[in-house]
């Protein structure tokens, strides 16, 4: 990270800036308003010291690092806290006061003595009394006019002072010291013109103490002659005389002197001898056009003195951009060596008009006459506001920035590239008659529209066609209008309302008032400001609690986007767009989005044009990030400090970055890929911008500009961070982790943390398995193994691993596993098998793959093991079973952070045709109820299996830990209605404190009212004692299942046990289970917006048509659920609500049976299409772009108005098919491999074909609905049809007698085998057609290899 400062506008006094060298480090200090700015460590370390009023002069003692600072009539002395420069900091040690006149100048000598100029010239010594510093006045003298400038020699023997416009310099010679008093003699040094500058020739501190016989004084006056005076002792007489002159040419405007000690320190001895300047001082005479003359002066340090000689060393030319060409005055602080950088000089230029520039000069280039060009690189630029910045307003494109203050000081700034990072350049100043309240910046900063505190609406022109360093920075007020003062309402936000096509001549601006009303204006610099018609915000009677402008973060101009976001007191959030109709002079406001966040009394809200929103809760310490496009919460975090500011930006790919501002620092967060498998957060802090080490002032405002530049305003200072990263930042280090990034910047890192995944990434493989692409995953794992093996053999770095593994992209788009082309690889690894699995796992334990963290690589090994296990069971487990086994494997590898398998995994098992096999694969792990709860067996295993597992668990719970406690297994035996076994166990529980009481009590008959009442009383007593499980047992003892499951659900908080007890006690689909699901589980599901759980609930309630709809629809929008839960309570607290796997299960179920299919017809095509696009966006956010393309390419939309569908819906036989589905246990669950798809039955292309079925083709599902009445149908024709056709899926839906009749007529094939089944399936695949082929709006054609496949959504989007 490169953090540059604009510490504040320097004050316009000659001694406002000072540069010195202390302990071989360059220190720079200057005055800005009432602040002292100190920069150290190569100008990277900043300290800001605040004073009572504006500062006038500052000087640094190069001997001990003390800093003297004057303001008004006082001088403050600051000492360094540490004597080492790693973390330099200064603190006040004493204060000086002489008289009431303002202090104009001050200078240190080496012996901690100080000369101060006001109306008096005074001389002070700062005495150290064991760490307590005491200022002692040693001499003072009233001056005829205020002292304008004063300098003191290093040995404190000579002081020179002048007044403003003086032609005579006063030289004060120290002649004696009596006690703590000093005596000075005066010598006048006449000049022909007013003196403009003067300085003493300096030596290193250790030399100056030993050699005090001779001093050289430089003076410059308006006659443009540099005079060198020599002050020396001769025969005990003090002598001062002119020792030489250096005239300046008419074009030369300034003079810079480099003392010989600086040359010796920065140049090697060899270079000094080569250029013959080892004993010379250098004088640089420069013009405002960048032309420089470099001279060497000799014999200035000789004792006894010799006549001065001078020679021209070189002539140089520097770029005008680094100098000033329009200023009248220049102040050049002393040149110093640049820290320990050999051959570099630190050169400062103060223009006395608000800017100090820091340049680096190569001294070898300066004295070398072989080249004319001199590179003077602009390292830093020190400017800013004079008073505190109130607000930062950026242009919509991020190219310009407006800063406002509490006064009339406002400025337009542009980013400026420096050698080390980015700074800001002041382009224009705007002086308004009243402080700016709101503003909008247009045309790359060339136009500013602002509303002032006094109600004036103004448009300013800010010219930019000037020279870069021009001091003509004023702006021009072009048009103005006054708003009528409203007493009841007031403007709360001002914004730009873009037209569909951008116009440079006019702009539309809107003012939103506190009641939601809006005033819109057309603003033209040439024609004026005109009010146009505007709608009010549709806020439905709600108050606007908080409102903010949405940050425009797109890389290009976008007009059709939300412009404002607002939130009510109860947390209802809305965003609005504006549509500008220029012809009608009308601005229309449309609600773009509305979500209920549930965050009441929020303190801050800020949105992004990419559809993100950040909200801070009422405490100011909880930040939540929302996706407005999907209406879900993506991230939430709680901080220790209150949040003050929020700002958004994005990469060119639309990946969001948000800054969360606090009082002294800002945290930068980037979005991450969605991870639905590991439940990792979707945002990550990647950098911390901390200014507390540089200033004690709080952050006032912050804003993002283009190209990842982040600007912070604090007081009158700016802190500018470019896009580069600080690799020592712990947040940055953690976010990069073990990844290798190509570019060290925040935008690139955000793209790496998002973007497409390599195809060997575990998340990609997991989502591919969910998308029914098991064969693709196997090939990818085999290719990964072969690629790593090849890299190992060829001794190549693993970073050369192809992220796509050389896979043909078309293979990702194959819809069904059975259509996947089998590719044979060379021996000894022709396909993925156990050998490959073990070898690949071993490789991954030794090799770190690119773009994968350690945790992700562990997950990849888990996926490999799961695929290996699935491969063994592939022929006996259907695909939902495969998905379930993968979920179990992932759960086992994440048990430390995951309590149980997910409801997604439960749904896979629930809709699998092989529940017994799935149970057997995990049965050995399920011993206790805790283990059973981990696998959520109460939700999905069959009733008879659950009864058996309850018996096993009851036995284990009784005997575990060798305590033989019947109370632990009581709930299970009573659910099994085996009270006698429980009684026997109590009789065996010798030593249990409650044995005798329980044996006597349980022995009673609880069908008798007396004992039933006694048991109920005991249950309530146990509830009052918080013995909830025992209370549930006593409720169940009295046959009060409802009270029992209520206790288990509400007090024990074990929904799994409640469901299990219901299913075992009253059988599947009993009334108590139905009430439990609807009264207890459903309301929470609606609040959590859990679609997996909602689908399960409706499946258990025998509402398949609603269960399939629940996969795509929010639970509150199903049936009459809006009356169960208030919509305001429903908050999408997680981005996981729209799992892409929901869509995969939906597609599977609508192919499963008729009731699911008819239920899917209730989902509108528009909703289905929208959901497809949203899931596609989610998959891309997950990094699974190939799978997103495959989903869009292969999805089939049902044409709801097609003839087959309409006749199906109108058929009376449909209702009989509905009624034939009884309890859930009787749901048709024959394996998909053995049963043709439901959609195979809709293969007739026309109505005539439907009414006249071809007897040679298999019997169609619709034949049973569309045939003539039963009395006109002969049994012979039925037998003939049945004998040649495969068994219809409707046999399981129609009446039992009809099914039995068909079974009798259909010949049975002897000795069925798996191989024959597979052959039968292959034959059926050739004949059968998917129902979606006929119900979709267009039949998809098999893509040719050379042609581009048409996207199915072309007809819908």
Swiss-Prot record:
Keywords: Membrane, Phosphoprotein, Protein transport, Repeat, Transport, WD repeat. The modification Phosphoserine is found at residues 1244, 1248. It comes from the Eukaryota. GO terms for cellular component: cytoplasm; endomembrane system; membrane; RAVE complex. InterPro entries: DmX-like/RAVE_component, Rav1p_C, WD40/YVTN_repeat-like_dom_sf, WD40_repeat_dom_sf, WD40_rpt. It is found in: Endomembrane system. GO terms for biological process: early endosome to late endosome transport; protein transport; regulation of protein-containing complex assembly; vacuolar acidification; vacuolar proton-transporting V-type ATPase complex assembly. Its main location: membrane. Residues 1243-1357 are annotated as: Disordered. Disulfide bonds: none annotated. Residues 1272-1288 have a biased composition (Low complexity). The keyword Phosphoprotein applies. WD repeats lie at residues 98-134, 142-182, 190-239, 384-423, 431-470, 595-636, 638-679, 898-939. Residues 1320-1332 have a biased composition (Basic and acidic residues). Present with 149 molecules/cell in log phase SD medium. Component of the RAVE complex composed of RAV1, RAV2 and CBF3D/SKP1. Within the complex, it interacts directly with RAV2 and CBF3D. Interacts with the V-ATPase V1 subunits VMA1, VMA2 and VMA8. Component of the RAVE complex, which is required for stable assembly of the vacuolar ATPase complex V-ATPase under many conditions. Required for transport between the early endosome and the late endosome/prevacuolar compartment (PVC), suggesting that assembly of vacuolar ATPase at the early endosome is required for transport from the early endosome to the PVC. This is Regulator of V-ATPase in vacuolar membrane protein 1.
């Amino acid at each position: 990270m490169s953090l540059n400062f604009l510490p504040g506008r320097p004050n316009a006094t000659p001694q406002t800036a000072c540069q010195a060298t202390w302990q071989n480090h360059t220190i720079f200090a200057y005055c800005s308003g009432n602040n002292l700015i100190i920069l150290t460590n190569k100008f990277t370390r900043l300290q800001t010291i605040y004073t009572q009023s504006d500062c006038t002069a500052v000087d640094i003692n190069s001997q001990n690092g003390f800093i003297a600072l004057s303001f008004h009539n006082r001088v403050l002395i600051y000492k360094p806290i540490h004597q080492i420069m790693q973390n330099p900091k200064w603190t006040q040690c004493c204060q000086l006061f002489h008289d009431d006149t303002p202090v104009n100048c001050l200078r240190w000598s080496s012996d901690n003595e100080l000369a101060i100029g006001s109306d008096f010239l005074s001389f002070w010594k700062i005495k150290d009394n064991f760490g307590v510093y005491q200022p002692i006045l040693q001499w003072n003298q009233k001056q005829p006019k205020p002292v304008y400038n004063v300098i003191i020699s290093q040995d404190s023997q000579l002081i020179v002072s002048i007044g403003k416009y003086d032609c005579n310099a006063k030289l004060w010679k120290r002649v004696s010291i009596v006690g703590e008093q000093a005596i000075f003699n005066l010598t006048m040094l006449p000049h022909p013109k007013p003196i403009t500058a003067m300085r003493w020739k300096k030596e290193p501190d250790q030399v100056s103490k030993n050699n005090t016989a001779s001093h050289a004084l430089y003076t410059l006056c308006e006659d443009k002659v540099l005079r060198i005076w020599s002050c020396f002792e001769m025969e005990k007489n003090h002598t001062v005389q002119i020792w030489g002159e250096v005239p300046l040419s008419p074009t030369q405007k300034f003079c810079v002197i480099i003392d010989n000690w600086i040359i010796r320190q920065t140049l090697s001895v060899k270079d000094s001898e080569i250029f013959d300047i080892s004993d010379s001082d250098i004088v640089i005479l420069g013009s405002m056009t960048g032309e420089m003359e470099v001279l060497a002066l000799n014999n200035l340090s000789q004792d006894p003195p010799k006549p001065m000689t001078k020679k021209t060393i070189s002539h140089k030319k520097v770029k005008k951009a680094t100098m000033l060409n329009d200023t009248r005055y220049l102040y050049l602080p002393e040149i110093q060596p640049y820290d320990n950088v050999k051959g570099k000089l630190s050169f400062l230029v103060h223009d006395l008009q608000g800017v100090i520039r820091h340049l680096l000069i190569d001294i070898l280039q300066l004295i070398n006459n072989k080249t004319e060009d001199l590179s003077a690189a602009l390292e830093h630029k020190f400017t800013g506001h004079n008073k505190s910045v109130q607000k930062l307003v950026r242009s919509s494109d991020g190219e310009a920035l407006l800063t406002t203050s509490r006064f009339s000081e406002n400025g337009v700034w542009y980013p400026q590239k420096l050698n080390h990072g980015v700074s800001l350049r002041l382009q224009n100043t705007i002086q308004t008659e009243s402080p700016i309240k709101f503003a909008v910046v247009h045309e790359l900063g060339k136009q500013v529209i602002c509303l002032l505190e006094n109600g004036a609406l103004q448009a300013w022109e800010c010219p930019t066609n000037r020279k870069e360093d021009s001091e003509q920075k004023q702006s021009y007020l072009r048009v103005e209008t006054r708003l009528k003062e409203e007493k009841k309402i007031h403007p709360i936000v001002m914004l730009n309302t873009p037209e569909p096509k951008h116009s440079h001549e006019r702009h539309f601006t809107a003012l939103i008032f506190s009641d939601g009303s809006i005033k819109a204006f057309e603003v033209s610099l040439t024609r004026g400001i005109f009010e146009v018609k505007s709608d009010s915000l549709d806020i439905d009677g709600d108050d606007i609690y908080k409102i903010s402008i949405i940050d425009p973060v797109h890389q290009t101009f976008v007009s059709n986007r939300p412009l404002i976001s607002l939130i009510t007191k109860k947390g209802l959030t809305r965003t609005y767009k504006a549509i500008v109709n220029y012809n009608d002079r009308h601005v229309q406001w449309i609600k773009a989005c509305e979500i209920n966040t549930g965050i009441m009394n929020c303190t801050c809200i800020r949105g992004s044009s990419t559809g993100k929103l950040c909200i801070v809760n009422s405490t100011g310490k909880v930040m939540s990030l929302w996706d407005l496009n999907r209406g879900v919460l993506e991230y939430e975090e709680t901080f220790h400090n209150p949040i003050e500011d929020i700002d958004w930006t994005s990469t060119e790919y639309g990946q969001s970055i948000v800054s969360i501002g606090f009082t002294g620092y800002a945290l930068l967060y980037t979005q991450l890929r969605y991870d639905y498998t590991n439940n990792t957060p979707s945002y990550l802090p990647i950098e911390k911008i901390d200014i507390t080490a540089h200033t004690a002032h709080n952050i006032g405002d912050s804003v993002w500009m283009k190209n990842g530049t982040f600007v912070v305003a604090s007081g009158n200072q700016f802190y500018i961070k470019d896009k580069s990263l600080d690799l020592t930042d712990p947040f940055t280090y953690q976010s990069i982790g073990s990844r290798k990034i190509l570019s060290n910047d925040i935008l690139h890192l955000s793209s790496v943390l998002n973007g497409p995944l390599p195809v060997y990434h575990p998340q990609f493989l997991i989502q591919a398995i969910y998308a029914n692409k098991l064969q693709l995953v196997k090939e990818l794992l085999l290719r990964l193994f072969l690629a790593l093996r090849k890299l190992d053999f060829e001794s190549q770095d693993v970073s050369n691993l192809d992220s796509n593994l050389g896979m043909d992209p078309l293979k990702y788009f194959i819809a069904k596993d059975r259509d996947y082309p089998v590719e044979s690889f060379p021996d000894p690894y022709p396909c993925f098998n156990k050998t490959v699995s073990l070898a690949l796992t071993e490789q991954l334990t030794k090799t770190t793959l690119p773009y994968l963290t350690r945790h992700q690589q562990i997950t990849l090994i888990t996926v490999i093991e799961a695929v290996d296990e699935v491969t063994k069971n592939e022929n006996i487990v259907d695909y939902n079973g495969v998905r379930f086994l993968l979920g179990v494997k992932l759960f086992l590898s994440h048990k430390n952070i995951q309590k149980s398998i997910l409801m997604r995994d439960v749904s896979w098992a629930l809709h699998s045709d092989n529940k017994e096999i799935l149970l057997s694969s995990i049965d050995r792990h399920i011993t206790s109820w805790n283990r059973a709860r981990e696998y959520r067996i109460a939700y999905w295993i069959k009733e008879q299996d659950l009864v058996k597992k309850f018996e096993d668990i009851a036995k284990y719970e009784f005997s575990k830990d060798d305590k033989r406690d019947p109370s632990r297994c009581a709930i299970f035996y009573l659910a099994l209605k085996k009270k006698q076994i429980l009684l026997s166990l109590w009789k065996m529980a010798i030593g249990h404190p409650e044995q005798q009481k329980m044996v006597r009590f349980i022995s009673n008959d609880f069908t008798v009212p007396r004992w039933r009442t006694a048991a109920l009383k005991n249950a309530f007593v146990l509830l009052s004692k918080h013995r909830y499980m025992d209370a549930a047992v006593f409720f169940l003892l009295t046959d009060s299942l409802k009270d029992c499951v209520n206790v288990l659900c509400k007090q024990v908080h074990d929904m799994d046990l409640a469901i299990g007890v219901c299913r075992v006690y009253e059988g599947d689909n009993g009334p108590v289970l139905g009430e439990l699901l609807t009264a207890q589980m459903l309301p929470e599901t609606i609040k959590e917006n859990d679609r997996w759980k909602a689908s399960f609930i409706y499946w258990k309630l025998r509402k398949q048509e609603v269960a399939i709809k629940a996969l795509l629809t929010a639970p509150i929008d199903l049936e009459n659920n809006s009356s169960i839960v208030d919509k305001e309570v429903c908050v999408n607290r997680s981005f996981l609500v729209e799992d892409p796997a929901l869509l995969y299960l939906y597609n599977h179920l609508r192919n499963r049976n008729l009731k699911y299919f008819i239920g899917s017809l209730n989902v509108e095509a528009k909703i289905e299409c929208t959901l497809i696009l949203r899931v596609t966006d989610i998959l891309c956010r997950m990094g699974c772009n190939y799978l997103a393309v495959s989903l869009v390419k292969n999805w089939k939309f049902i044409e709801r108005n097609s003839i087959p569908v309409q006749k199906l819906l109108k058929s009376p036989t449909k209702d009989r098919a509905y009624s034939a589905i009884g309890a859930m246990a009787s749901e048709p669950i024959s394996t998909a491999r053995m049963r043709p798809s439901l959609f195979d039955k809709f293969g007739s292309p026309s109505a005539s074909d439907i009414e006249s079925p071809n007897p040679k083709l298999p019997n169609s599902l619709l034949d049973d609905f569309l045939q003539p009445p039963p009395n006109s149908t002969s049994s012979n024709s039925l037998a003939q049809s049945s004998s040649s056709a495969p068994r219809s899926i409707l046999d399981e839906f129609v009446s039992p007698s009809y099914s039995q009749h068909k079974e009798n007529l259909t010949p049975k094939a002897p000795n069925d085998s798996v191989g024959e089944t597979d052959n039968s399936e292959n034959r059926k695949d050739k004949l059968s057609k998917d129902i979606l082929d006929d119900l979709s709006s267009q039949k998809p054609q098999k893509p040719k290899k050379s042609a581009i496949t048409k996207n199915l959504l072309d007809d819908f989007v």
